[in-house]
């Protein structure tokens, strides 16, 4: 089966978010045909949009996933799996930028550049978010330090399609805007124990 390298962002700020991300990574690795290839450091990050909520924990994973017969089919299949996992972890429809039990975002899917309609089982769980398109690379990733910092841990030299620059360049640019205190690495992934090791 042909595979493609995908990058998925994870975030949570309800309950024990670090433990939730550990369980989320295990669930991603257990998806059919998926191989876990890398896990970023764990970051403590300030909320975006709605400030009156707990800080988030964010990470990014590198996955080899089934490519599908074409990039659109492969990306949609992964999206549907991600949304299914969100629901399995208790994610409910909430306001956009609000608290999350578990948030899984498809950031990059190989060299694909897509803007396709989401199937019903792949729609966003953000209340009031009218966008029904799956956009790959993720349309907001280049402007979110909480995505760029962990993504740069895994693929600093990656230039996602349409960006015109590398992940590390985008990370440094956003850090200059948001300040280095906006995201803080707090743990590394221990592949042997499949858990975070505090820094």
Predicted regions and their residues:
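Nucleotide and nucleotide-moiety/phosphate-recognizing core
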Residues: 1-8, 14-101, 109-112
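Flexible, gly/pro- and Lys/Arg-enriched active-site loops
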Residues: 48-56, 76-199
